[in-house]
């Protein structure tokens, strides 16, 4: 075939494709494909292996497969043996033929054929053309090099049509001729192309006949009038001007009829094949040609052509790839025409697949891998006999010996290497034909064994199933001693290959008669290979598969497309017909690539699909034990590892998903690795516990990541699920995932729980990563958050504003996920919270809060201010906490019950919280620097990561506001002041107030929940809570003064916050004076009680429960409690369901949805709102005002925050802390400075 520049060979000698076909030598090649002589290890026969790069834009093999299968059983058509594809190339295996006619003609001494040979060849070519037309296809590249003589004595006198890469279906499903395109583009080879082709007109059946006419003239004359002209336009003009009757002088007189007839045909007219055949018959009679006469090349000793080295088994495949094989070197691309014309419109179900690579047609079921007998005795290659170099074939095989062994580590070469459909090199000893027999036997036995294994696999029509199978295999491999998840990554390369390779559904020999998806028996070996190779041979049938193997479950188009999509590169691989303009009937192939693209997402897409459809990933995490989650993650990790880049490319199906995926996509991939690692370490324990420890030191990081990434995944899931499914499910799923991960992390490393204790590991790791990540991440996440959030918020906010609260939640979640890892972590913590119901509510609240948090994330300064405000409010909160604790104690019984539940949840959460603390600390580190620069004037509190404290303080600040409001409500002057201040700031910093209020509530809850944060406690379920509370206290301590000063300094008016700040300073400062190191904050029973109460409130299974209990607690505890309850009642609907709040959220989101969404999530807990009825009111409007920075803390998210605070205390710490609290923790001064800019920004 002509065309195309030299490129390195796709395959090398000795390579084993699909563990079945061993490459012996390259026969030909061109721009878009290569042809190899290969040895079928099953049948021991030589076959033609046609390969095209998976990356090349023009893919023709799928069309070739489609047409070749359609033509099976026709004379003059090669037997189809198999096909497939992997990440590197697509391939088709067919019967190997002898030399092509162009080669044979040139081999003649005169470069011409005799009339006898020409007439007999012409008649066979006409028959082959009629055959392809009979199935509704045009060849469109009729030329001597696309016809070859058979290799064996039985077929050496039969001419076979080759290369259907440029074929086009000219009939529709009804069998009617398709309407021609006005401009079709040039197809074919310039020398033999018809005038219509040169005119870019739609080619019809008569155009193939015109090409035949030119061939006949060339056979007889040795050349055409335009022989030396290469330019298509010039040749076209010559053809138009040339009197074709002049050509007849070289042909028998009867051919005038042939010329007249084809000249009279048009696109719609069916040629009279019988008439044309009669022309040949009459001419044969006229010239006295006998069918049995030897062809010119068979005449021994007449010319050296017989012994030309090129004859050595030169397959039917031309020494030169035809334009079709090359991708139509001579075709003129017409926009939209090239990619789709051929294959896309062929068969919707037609796809390159190894699934069909079964037993060759000639092979009986008995002669499968298990059987030693060859399907049929190999006939001697007549061409080899004529070729002095006939043995030359064996030479090339001997190359890759040790190299193969070393590179593949294959003891058995073919068997052991997970070729995943990728070529495997055969040991040199195997290379020689004589040695192939034992190898074949071994292969057969192995394949039989593998086939059995494979047969045990579920039918793989589903990509998901395929992925699951791969994951199982991966897991098995990893458990077998492959490496833990990280090794899985190395293994992952295989996995991606597997995805592709697996996606190489083997359609074997058999072409199903109309089968859109021909399925042919897959040899056990193949089936086996499919399983082992990663090729998902969907063959469900027994080892002895029928040629017609309809049992082969051919993956659906979409699934196949997913297969291609597994690597988006593959997705690009999807072969497009030459013309995009016209969908062609043979669209299957194109679809399959797209499907593969979908699979590219197998991880992400499937993950998303699973999330969307059933939250499978999360759901699995939730539904399945941690192990399942980790398995899923691990599997996905494996899949993702290879497909990570591809997965990243996966496009979100919805704006929310896009938002979630935007940053999350990247995160998603990391998450699988890290998250998987975590979950894996915890659940699978792939590696030794030490590895778990490693993971765990990483786990803080991982959790940091996983909070981000996992949570990002969760968030993505939330966003996606929220968009696609129920957020509640997400919440549950996330919780389960969190639980799974947390338990895994716990199992893997208590140090994670000890995060504070192991700060060296977690904090250091977290710090390192978070300094990198926080600074980078926070900044990046802020950048991402800000950019992504801004973009998303631009999208998400718009969506939030426009969309329903639920959507807001989704968008916010996505935003949150994208906004900050901390926020993500925060959300994740919330998600991870054991209490699913609460988690759902929280998730909802978080979703709402997320929108708030996201805005916050966008504006770190705003976050800082918010954090400061929150801290100030927290101080108030502590004062209020004192009050509330008094009033709440009454309710404590109920709260304790809730706390017990929530404590359990928080047991899980604290770890995340710890991670978040670490993350917050780490994140705080970089932001803190900024903050320190910004707020160096602010008093520095202990630099010890008071993140939890800060977070707690933030929570408390919000809680304090709620409590404060309660106190204010109790004390008329306070409520009045608060109201006045709130009213003033409703427009500016109402969100800040809300966030403060929610922060107070949250902190109160945190204080109650965290209690002491000791290593023991860290290990203990409540230890996490204690840690959170302790951290929150420390943070509060560090935050209070700076935050108060900053808050006071901050221009964001916070009436409640100001009052609360004073109160907080008064009451909280003593409480926070200790500022214990992050490792072990002092235990504060009172604070813990308050936190627990709020926690209980926040963690209530349902908003109604939460609100009712809060109401009871608050009412019983104090008027403030009542007001809190009241606020919660309205707020809770806002928070979880957020109907009222949703408007608020949009308001917040528009102004500060990024930040506010990040903080609001934590602060948005319904309790904080409950704490502040007026805040509820404000939260709808004030959120708008304050959502800019503090609002994010206060906003409607505040109510969420309070609930989330309990669950997400760490997470809240993460986001808030990261934004402001963390800065404070690093340097409380810094946060204030930051908070000021934040408040300015918010304003």
Curated annotation (Swiss-Prot):
It is an enzyme of class 2 (transferase). Disruption phenotype: Defects in Ttbk2 are the cause of the bartleby (bby) phenotype characterized by defects in sonic hedgehog/SHH signaling and ciliogenesis. Embryos display morphological defects at midgestation similar to those seen in mutants that lack cilia, including holoprosencephaly, twisted body axis, abnormal limb development and randomized laterality of heart looping. Mutants die at midgestation (around 10.5 dpc). The keyword tRNA-binding does not apply. It comes from the Eukaryota. The keyword Chloroplast does not apply. Its main location: other. One of its GO terms (biological process) is cerebellar granule cell precursor tangential migration. It catalyses: L-seryl-[protein] + ATP = O-phospho-L-seryl-[protein] + ADP + H(+); L-threonyl-[protein] + ATP = O-phospho-L-threonyl-[protein] + ADP + H(+). The active site is at 141 (proton acceptor). Serine/threonine kinase that acts as a key regulator of ciliogenesis: controls the initiation of ciliogenesis by binding to the distal end of the basal body and promoting the removal of CCP110, which caps the mother centriole, leading to the recruitment of IFT proteins, which build the ciliary axoneme. Has some substrate preference for proteins that are already phosphorylated on a Tyr residue at the +2 position relative to the phosphorylation site. Able to phosphorylate tau on serines in vitro. One of its GO terms (cellular component) is ciliary basal body. SMART domains: S_TKc (SM00220). Interacts with CEP164. Interacts with MCRS1; the interaction is required for recruitment of TTBK2 to the mother centriole. Its EC number is 2.7.11.1. Residues 674-683, 1115-1129 have a biased composition (Polar residues). Keywords: ATP-binding, Cell projection, Cilium, Cilium biogenesis/degradation, Cytoplasm, Cytoskeleton, Kinase, Nucleotide-binding, Nucleus, Phosphoprotein, Serine/threonine-protein kinase, Transferase. One of its GO terms (molecular function) is ATP binding. This is Tau-tubulin kinase 2. Residues 1073-1084 have a biased composition (Pro residues). It is found in: Cell projection, Cilium; Cytoplasm, Cytoskeleton, Cilium basal body; Cytoplasm, Cytoskeleton, Microtubule organizing center, Centrosome, Centriole; Cytoplasm, Cytosol. Pfam families: Pkinase. The modification Phosphoserine is found at residues 445, 786, 1102. ATP binds at residues 27-35, 50. InterPro entries: CK1_Ser-Thr_kinase (IPR050235), Kinase-like_dom_sf (IPR011009), Prot_kinase_dom (IPR000719), Protein_kinase_ATP_BS (IPR017441), TTBK2_STKc (IPR047915). Residues 674-695, 737-761, 1063-1086, 1115-1243 are annotated as: Disordered. Disulfide bonds: none annotated. The lineage of its organism: Eukaryota, Metazoa, Chordata, Craniata, Vertebrata.
């Amino acid at each position: 075939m002509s065309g195309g520049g030299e490129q390195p060979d796709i395959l090398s000698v000795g390579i084993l494709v699909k563990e079945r076909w061993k490459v012996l030598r390259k026969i030909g090649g061109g721009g878009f494909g290569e042809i190899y002589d290969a040895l079928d290890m099953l049948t021991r026969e030589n076959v033609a292996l046609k390969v095209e790069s998976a990356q090349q834009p023009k893919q023709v093999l799928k069309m070739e497969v489609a047409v070749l299968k359609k033509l099976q059983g026709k004379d003059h058509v090669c037997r189809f043996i198999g096909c497939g594809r992997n990440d590197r190339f697509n391939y088709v295996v067919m019967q190997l033929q002898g030399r092509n006619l162009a080669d044979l003609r040139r081999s003649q001494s005169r470069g011409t054929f005799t009339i006898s040979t020409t007439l007999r060849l012409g008649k066979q070519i006409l028959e082959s053309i009629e055959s392809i037309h009979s199935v509704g296809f045009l060849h469109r590249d009729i030329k001597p090099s696309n016809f070859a003589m058979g290799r064996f004595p039985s077929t050496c006198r039969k001419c076979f049509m080759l290369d259907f890469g440029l074929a086009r279906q000219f009939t529709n499903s009804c069998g009617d001729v398709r309407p021609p395109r006005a401009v079709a583009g040039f197809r074919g080879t310039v020398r033999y192309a018809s005038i219509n082709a040169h005119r870019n007109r739609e080619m019809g059946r008569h155009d193939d006949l015109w090409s035949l006419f030119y061939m006949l003239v060339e056979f007889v004359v040795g050349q055409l009038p335009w022989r030396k002209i290469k330019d298509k336009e010039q040749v076209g003009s010559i053809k138009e001007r040339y009197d074709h009757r002049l050509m007849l002088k070289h042909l028998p007189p009867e051919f005038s009829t042939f010329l007249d007839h084809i000249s009279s045909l048009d696109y719609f007219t069916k040629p009279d094949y019988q008439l044309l055949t009669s022309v040949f018959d009459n001419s044969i009679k006229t010239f006295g040609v006998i069918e049995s006469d030897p062809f010119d090349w068979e005449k021994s000793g007449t010319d050296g052509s017989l012994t030309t080295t090129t004859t050595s088994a030169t397959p039917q495949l031309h020494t030169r790839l035809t334009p079709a094989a090359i991708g139509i070197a001579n075709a003129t691309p017409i926009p939209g025409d090239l990619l789709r014309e051929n294959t896309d419109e062929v068969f919707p179900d037609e796809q390159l697949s190894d699934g069909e690579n079964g037993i060759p047609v000639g092979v009986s079921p008995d002669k499968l891998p298990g059987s030693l007998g060859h399907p049929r005795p190999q006939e001697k290659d007549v061409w080899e006999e004529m070729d002095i170099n006939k043995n030359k074939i064996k030479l090339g095989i001997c190359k890759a010996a040790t190299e193969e062994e070393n590179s593949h580590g294959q003891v058995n070469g073919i068997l052991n290497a997970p070729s995943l459909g990728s070529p495997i090199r055969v040991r040199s000893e195997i290379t020689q034909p004589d040695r192939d027999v034992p190898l074949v036997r071994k292969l057969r036995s192995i394949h039989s064994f593998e086939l059995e294994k494979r047969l045990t696999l579920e039918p793989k029509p589903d990509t998901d199933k395929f992925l699951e199978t791969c994951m199982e295999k991966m897991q098995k491999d990893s458990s077998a001693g492959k490496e833990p998840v990280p090794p899985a990554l190395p293994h992952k390369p295989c996995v991606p290959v597997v995805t592709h390779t697996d996606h190489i559904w083997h359609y074997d020999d058999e072409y199903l008669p109309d089968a859109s998806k021909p399925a042919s028996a897959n040899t056990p070996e193949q089936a086996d290979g499919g399983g082992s190779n990663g090729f998902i041979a969907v063959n469900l049938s027994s080892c002895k598969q029928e040629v017609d193997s309809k049992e082969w479950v051919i993956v659906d188009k979409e699934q196949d497309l997913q297969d291609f999509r597994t690597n988006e590169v593959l997705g690009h691989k999807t072969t497009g017909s030459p013309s995009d303009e016209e969908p062609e009937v043979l669209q299957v192939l194109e679809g399959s690539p797209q499907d593969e693209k979908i699979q590219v997402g197998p991880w992400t897409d499937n993950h998303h699909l699973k999330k969307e459809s059933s939250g499978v990933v999360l759901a699995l995490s939730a539904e399945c034990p941690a192990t399942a989650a980790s398995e899923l993650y691990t599997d996905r990790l494996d899949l993702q590892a290879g497909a990570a880049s591809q997965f990243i490319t996966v496009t979100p199906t919805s704006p929310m998903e896009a938002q979630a995926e935007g940053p999350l996509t990247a995160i998603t991939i990391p998450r699988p690795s890290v998250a998987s690692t975590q979950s894996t370490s915890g659940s699978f324990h792939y590696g030794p516990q030490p590895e778990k420890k490693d993971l765990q030191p990483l786990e803080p990081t991982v959790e940091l990541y996983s909070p981000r990434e996992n949570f990002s995944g969760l968030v993505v899931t939330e966003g996606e699920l929220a968009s696609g499914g129920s957020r509640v499910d997400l919440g549950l799923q996330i919780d389960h995932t969190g639980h799974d991960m947390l338990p895994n992390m716990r199992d893997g490393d208590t140090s994670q729980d000890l995060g504070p204790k192991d700060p060296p590991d977690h904090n250091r790791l977290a710090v390192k990563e978070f300094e990198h990540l926080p600074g980078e991440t926070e900044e990046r996440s802020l950048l991402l958050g800000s950019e992504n959030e801004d973009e998303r918020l631009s999208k998400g906010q718009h969506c939030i504003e426009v969309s329903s609260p639920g959507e807001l939640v989704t968008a916010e979640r996505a935003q949150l996920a994208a906004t900050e890892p901390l926020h993500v972590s925060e959300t994740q913590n919330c998600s991870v919270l054991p209490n699913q119901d609460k988690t759902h509510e929280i998730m909802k609240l978080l979703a709402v809060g997320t929108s708030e948090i996201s805005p916050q994330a966008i504006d770190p300064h705003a976050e800082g201010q918010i954090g400061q405000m929150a801290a100030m409010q927290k101080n108030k909160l502590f004062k209020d906490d004192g009050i509330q604790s008094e009033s709440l104690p009454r309710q404590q019984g109920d709260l304790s019950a809730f706390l017990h539940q929530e404590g359990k949840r928080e047991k899980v959460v604290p770890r995340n919280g710890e991670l978040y603390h670490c993350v917050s600390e780490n994140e705080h580190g970089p932001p803190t620097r900024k903050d320190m620069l910004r707020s160096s004037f602010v008093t520095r509190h202990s630099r010890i990561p008071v993140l939890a404290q800060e977070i707690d303080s933030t929570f408390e600040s919000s809680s304090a506001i709620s409590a404060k409001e309660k106190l204010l409500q109790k004390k008329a002057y306070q409520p009045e002041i608060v109201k006045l201040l709130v009213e003033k700031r409703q427009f500016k910093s109402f969100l800040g107030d809300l966030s403060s209020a929610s922060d107070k509530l949250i902190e109160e809850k945190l204080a109650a929940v965290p209690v002491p944060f000791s290593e023991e406690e860290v290990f203990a379920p409540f230890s996490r809570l204690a840690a959170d509370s302790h951290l929150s206290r420390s943070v509060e301590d560090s935050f209070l003064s700076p935050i108060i000063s900053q808050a006071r300094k901050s221009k964001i008016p916070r009436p409640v916050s100001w009052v609360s700040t004073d109160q907080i300073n008064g009451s909280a400062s003593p409480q926070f004076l200790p500022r214990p190191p992050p490792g072990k904050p002092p235990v504060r029973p009172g604070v813990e009680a308050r936190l627990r109460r709020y926690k209980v409130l926040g963690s209530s299974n349902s908003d109604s429960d939460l609100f009712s209990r809060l109401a009871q607690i608050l009412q019983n505890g104090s008027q403030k409690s009542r007001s809190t309850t009241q606020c919660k009642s309205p707020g809770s609907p806002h928070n979880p369901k957020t109907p009222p709040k949703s408007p608020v959220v949009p308001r917040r989101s528009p102004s500060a949805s990024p930040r506010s969404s990040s903080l609001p999530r934590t602060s948005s807990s319904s309790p904080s709102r409950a704490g502040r009825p007026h805040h509820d009111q404000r939260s709808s409007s004030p959120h708008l005002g304050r959502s800019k920075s503090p609002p994010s803390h206060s906003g409607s998210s505040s109510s969420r925050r309070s609930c989330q605070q309990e669950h997400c205390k760490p997470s809240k710490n993460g986001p808030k802390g990261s934004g402001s609290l963390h800065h404070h923790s690093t340097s409380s001064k810094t946060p204030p400075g930051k908070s000021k800019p934040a408040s300015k920004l918010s304003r």
